[in-house]
Amino acid sequence: MFQLTDIPRLLPEILLLVLALLVLGSDILERWGRTPEAQLERVKSSASLTAIGLGMVLVVALLQSGYLYQLPETAPVNFFTNIIRNLQSGGPGGDPIIGVFATDHLTMIARLLIIGAALVTSLLCLDIRPNAHPGEFYALIIFATLGMCLMVGANELLLAYLAIELTSIPLYLLAGYFRNDPRSAEAGLKYFLFGAISSAILLYGMSLAFGAALNAVGGATNFNDLTRFDRIGAFTGSSGGLLTLAMLFIVAGMGYKLAVVPFHGWSPDVYEGSPTPITAFISTASKAAGFILLFRLLTETFPAMAGAPTLNEEAGGWTAVLAVLALLTVVIGNLAALPQTNVKRLLAYSSIAHAGFVLLGLLAWAAAQPFDREQGLIALLYYLIIYSLTNLGAFGALALIGQQTGGDDLDHLRGLSRRNLPLALLFTVCILSLAGIPPLGGFFAKFYIFMAGWQSGATWLVVIAVVMTIVSLYYYLRLLKAMFIEPARDEAPVSMPRGIGAALTIAVIGVLVLGIFPNLILSVLERV
């Protein structure tokens, strides 16, 4: 039953909903202006309101979590301490709200990551000129953020599905937002069609899980109930077969959402055709939310079916399925990136390959020791944080290059260091982090992920992943060669607007600091 004391626990989600409606409302009130100057002011107003609002929601979520500051019990009572005390009353812990939404440490950390990614995306969009209704563009970003926050805390099958749809529908619209651009229109249509198929597959898997529970114990959609029934061996005979089939359909449906091979066909075209800041948002926040929901679905709904990703007679379960998907994803993602000449398409295949690395963190659930399982989850979260910062920076730099040079092919990077050295250096840090070069965050993220895979028994997969990491150096170094060695195709300087400059700086500082001082974030992740 919902109680008033649950409201503080949902405060970030409530604020996101209010912010989305506020952005829409403010845009409607300003629609009386039809001149180009009035249209420009509407864009600036919607963009600024979104960025400031997301920044405030991020501060609220950070204070609520207690990770930055925990109010002492002996603190004096005044106006400010009362605000912080009320905020932190909704901090990590407690039973799931009405049994369907968990506010544990995993939700808190993922919520901060998603809102932070949305904030950086809104900064990247400051110089985008949407169509006649800019408020809709920014409101869609906020609604998608709200859906992702609900995804990571979902503790029930129906809420998980609704949260996925609340995330997906705004992203379909954002991908195809520039209708006059054929590539954007194609991206939106393709994203919608593949997304609809994946949603159908996922919903069918969830219905099979409910059917298995209905056949065995009278029905259940709550993760905790399904976990309890699974562990006591309630799913036997036909119920066990239904549950296995449900697991396969759920993995396939989530595989589409996460662009895991062989469900990745939509990803390169959608990444290439979408507005570049939206591509950054899809490849980071959306993927992070998807992987965390997949972790909850598999470890909380099918814990007894984990199996092992080894090459001996113990192999089986969903970890073996994920191991095969990780192998295909890492190999095909990296090999397909080698011949690419369009940088957005190259980074799309790079993102596919990185999804394979993240799957290695999930395999640690097969480890015999609980400590190793915990380390696997920490490695997965650390990887998602570093990957999100790095990809936001890389796509943000590419968005600026595309605006200034008129394209995002490899040729448009040529001589960038002579046209804007700070931009080239910021882009270089992101590329080197994606490649896993020390001492950047990408190196330690891959190291922890490889350790998690090794502890799970998938040593064969770790070896292949290391080899593919070396292969990836080729296409990443091609980008650096174009920026620093090849002659410029145009000598005109490339300017860096303040919004994109701020977003890139935030991302690069995060990659550097969390790489050189990983304990700053690992000490927080250990609470999960």
Swiss-Prot record:
It is a multi-pass membrane protein. InterPro entries: NADH-Q_OxRdtase_suN/2, ND/Mrp_TM. GO terms for biological process: ATP synthesis coupled electron transport. Its main location: membrane. It comes from Chloroflexus aurantiacus (strain ATCC 29364 / DSM 637 / Y-400-fl). Keywords: Cell membrane, Membrane, NAD, Quinone, Translocase, Transmembrane, Transmembrane helix, Transport, Ubiquinone. It catalyses: a quinone + NADH + 5 H(+)(in) = a quinol + NAD(+) + 4 H(+)(out). The keyword Transmembrane helix applies. This is NADH-quinone oxidoreductase subunit N.
